[in-house]
Amino acid sequence: MEKSGRESDGAPCGPVLHIVVVGFHHKKGCQVEFSYPPLIPGDGHDSHTLPEEWKYLPFLALPDGAHNYQEDTVFFHLPPRNGNGATVYGISCYRQIEAKALKVRQADITRETVQKSVCVLSKLPLYGLLQAKLQLITHAYFEEKDFSQISILKELYEHMNSSLGGASLEGSQVYLGLSPRDLVLHFRHKVLILFKLILLEKKVLFYISPVNRLVGALMTVLSLFPGMIEHGLSDCSQYRPRKSMSEDAGPQESNPSADDFTSESTSDVLNTSLETVTRVMAVNHGEDAVPKTEKPYFQVEGNNNKGQEPSDSGRYLELPPRPSPESSESDWETLDPSVLEDASLKEREQMGSDQTHLFQKDSLPSDSPPITVQPQANNRQVVLIPGLISGLEEDQYGMPLAIFTKGYLCLPYMALQQHHLLSDVTVRGFVAGATNILFRQQKHLSDAIVEVEEALIQIHDPELRKLLNPTTADLRFADYLVRHVTENRDDVFLDGTGWEGGDEWIRAQFAVYIHALLAATLQLDNEKMLSDYGTTFVAAWKNTHNYRVWNSNKHPALSEINPNHPFQGQYSVSDMKLRFSHSVQNSERGKKIGSVMVTTSRNVVQTGKAVGQSVGGAFSSAKTAMSSWLSTFTTSTPQSLPEPPNGKP
């Protein structure tokens, strides 16, 4: 059975890399108790040893405050091993059981309850699908009441790899468990603010407990970006660490010098046409290609670095040795145009003006994208690539955008032990989730805090708040989403699977929005078009890494897209109502006014009822008294005039 899930070289042949059990030890804390296959080749299944890159795995699988919940689910991301490959997607289901209920109680179980977590480490971002399977197995594993029975976990590994071996990242199974309908119902028009906030590559922290609500909200927001879940997170847990602590005091980003790049000779490039972009030319980049003082974000390392680890390894999310072709490719593909311009300027000083046209945009045809030189680490070769490519699998529109690249992290759940990442100078930004209140209290480490429970977005910088203030067209778009979702919220037959107002429909609306926005940026005389999206917002977005990468390439399919805002139009009375509603719900003054209005309305209603009851009661009493008096008068009159004797008056 073991052979069916592994290739001849011992590497997993399916999407699942490992099944891991994490437990809580009363002295050692969270630790790995079982892994299949072993996390480190050659170790036993019960080894506690962890790869350096995955040292936070136990704290991610068994999160803070796990003892407060009977069971929960966690999504988390791990960096690739040895810097090779892509993000490892982790799904964890944890439960707790009373120790007295166990059939076999081990000697190290000293507490009244036992907490354990079963994890799947996968190469595919099938969060909801893996969660559904894992919850069933975790329940069965705990029902055994004997945690030494590990056969069910091995069967889970084999079953998942056999059933998901040909799994595709296209289709609804990728979005299983991620509901934009619930997100829109909860955040309403603020969903668009979250969308734009991530487009600007800001530091965004989601906060709520328990963890399943946290990761669900965060990943659902990301699912609104076309292709992001399927292909946009492969580089979301990687970044280049500094080699020494002293460098942390430097600027957050510095452009690598020309010496950090590998360049071709002028004669070779002159003989290469722009159309032959895949031609491979040998180049030797030895020790002189390695910087001596600082390791920049993107660096071509020589063979002498093989197996070398940074001295301060304890504070890094990833400890890459000499990069593989994949990691080297990822580094070079995410360079922004300014890096190339800086490189060309330094080459001009060193090589002379006759050898600088390799990286000068002016020397290229006006309709040709800039050229980058992409090194290949293993075979010491470079490939000429037209434009800047993201390293992600893109569609005809350039989706997904290269947001989670070049040190911009996506961490659905962050353990307290990873707190240093928020202030690490080599991390450009992040979209991260936390349940520990310490993260929320450190407001200076983030640009925005999203409190999921209250559907509140706290943006610390007033200028950023102005930047994200929705335009009239944006408010119409958000209102359109909210109305269609709320109209169908009670439809038992919809359940998020229908079209209009359903999950897929909402994602389609955001796809239309981002396609139109991208198309608008390519138009001439587009000031009016861009004003519907927010002129200052678009200006800020054009300076982000993801837009520069996208804009450096041509996307002919966008010529068929209408660049106008989907909800452009003349200002009307209904727009005034939308603007007032938005202001009341978001500004502090508006919230106070709204609270006063609600309180006043309630008091008026209650007073009206009281007055009505008093007036009505008095009128009713008067009416009753009058009727009683008349009735007494009519009945007492014959008695006061007795009939005379003998029948005569």
Curated annotation (Swiss-Prot):
The keyword Transmembrane applies. Disulfide bonds: none annotated. Residues 17-161 form the uDENN domain. Keywords: Endosome, Membrane, Methylation, Phosphoprotein, Transmembrane, Transmembrane helix. The chain crosses the membrane at residues 204-229. The modification Phosphoserine is found at residue 244. One of its GO terms (cellular component) is recycling endosome. It is a single-pass membrane protein. One of its GO terms (biological process) is cell migration. This is Late secretory pathway protein AVL9 homolog. It comes from Mus musculus (Mouse). The gene is Avl9.
